Amino acid sequence: MFAVNAAPHIPVPYFMLQSRYDTWQVGSELGSKDESAVNAFGQALAAHVTGALAQSVAGSGLFLDACSHHTAMGDDIWKDVTVDNVTTREATALWLGSVFGGCQAALRRSCIPVGAGAVSCPLA
């Protein structure tokens, strides 16, 4: 993942939208549909992106979901994918407000799930 490797070197606050099970990454980087391998990949990816966030400039944020999708271009991703009952759209708005309003700690609590139970995905 090029972006996550570059993230600690970006000199301005940024907001990552990332799925633990990004369909392109699972297919192209992992190359397996084995459930155990995919789950391990998702855990490793989560550790990698949260580590990058911890090394990033203050004000940076992350919306890390556990849904199977690639990119955030579909309208359903903005409205239906949630972490702790916060949609992608709401998390992005929270982050934009936090950059100017000093709410970064609250944003990180809301957008980085602790355990699998914190994430919900829409039914296909």
Predicted regions and their residues:
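C-terminal His-loop and adjacent cap/lid subdomain of alpha/beta-hydrolase
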Residues: 1-124
